[in-house]
């Protein structure tokens, strides 16, 4: 059973990484079609929230809504944590290549381990430390190549990684109190709400633009 769980865990991490690496490609197409970061993320998270609500509603098994306090915590995880990480990341890929952005972004496990060690006293194993050092060397080499990265882009990606770290550490505790579908539904709803509020409240000097052509929506 343990081996099956580990295999499933590796598979899910791989699929998550694959999906995250593909997102910038679609975003670039939207940018080329006239959209900006917030316009892309409004569409992305609104669709995600609706889909997760439908999946939760029609998936097998009885699912109960969590207590109001937990609902609020999950909503804030999306409205502050996940939306913040996405905003920094998708803004970064407007300033440098998507490939470099992805590589640098994956330094976030280093932040997770270090902050988890400092805050939750979770001491990493030797294998983990070795893997993280290797990852940091790879990121440094990639970011240091001439013309590959910009200072602004690197800072934005690192901010995204750091924000996602706090989201991961906070979410690991909140998600234990509810089922996965319910938790993700509230997180996506929180993220979508944050960007809709930005659109409604943003000054005219920072307009939100959506794709102007069909290719940007596909």
Question: Where are the predicted features?
Answer:
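Glycine-/small-residue-enriched transmembrane alpha-helix faces in small-molecule transporters
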Residues: 1-43, 146-173, 193-197, 216-218
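Juxtamembrane C-cap of transmembrane helices in multi-pass membrane transport proteins
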Residues: 19-34, 47, 86-96, 104, ...
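Specific alpha-helical transmembrane segments that line the substrate/conduction pathway
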Residues: 39-50, 86-121, 160
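Membrane-interface helix caps and helix-loop-helix hairpins in membrane proteins
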Residues: 91-96, 143-152, 173, 205-210
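Cytoplasmic-side transmembrane-helix entry/capping segments in multi-pass membrane proteins
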Residues: 10-14, 68-77, 124-136, 153-158, ...
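Hydrophobic transmembrane alpha-helices of multi-pass small-molecule transport proteins
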Residues: 52, 115, 124-144, 161, ...
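Specific transmembrane alpha-helical segments of multi-pass solute transporters/efflux pumps
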Residues: 19, 24, 53, 57-99, ...
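Transmembrane alpha-helices of multi-pass small-molecule transport proteins
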Residues: 33-84, 111-112, 163-170, 184-203
């Amino acid at each position: 059973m343990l081996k099956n769980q580990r295999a499933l865990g590796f598979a899910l991490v791989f699929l998550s990484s694959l999906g995250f690496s593909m997102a910038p490609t679609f975003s670039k197409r939207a940018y080329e079609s006239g959209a900006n970061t917030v316009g892309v993320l409004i569409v992305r998270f609104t669709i995600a929230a609706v889909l997760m609500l439908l999946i939760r509603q029609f998936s097998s098994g009885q699912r109960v809504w969590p207590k109001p306090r937990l609902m609020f915590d999950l909503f804030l995880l999306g409205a502050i944590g996940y939306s913040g990480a996405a905003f920094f990341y998708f803004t970064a890929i407007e300033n440098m290549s998507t490939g470099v952005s992805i590589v640098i972004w994956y330094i976030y496990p280093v932040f997770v381990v270090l902050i988890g060690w400092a805050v939750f006293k979770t001491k990493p194993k030797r294998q983990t430390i070795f893997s993280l050092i290797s990852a940091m060397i790879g990121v440094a080499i990639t970011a240091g190549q001439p013309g590959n990265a910009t200072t602004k882009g690197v800072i934005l990606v690192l901010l995204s990684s750091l924000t996602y770290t706090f989201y991961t550490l906070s979410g690991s505790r909140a998600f234990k109190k509810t089922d996965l579908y319910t938790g993700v539904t509230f997180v996506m709803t929180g993220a979508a709400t944050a960007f809709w509020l930005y659109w409604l409240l943003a000054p005219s000097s920072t307009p939100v633009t959506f794709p102007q052509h069909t290719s940007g929506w596909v």
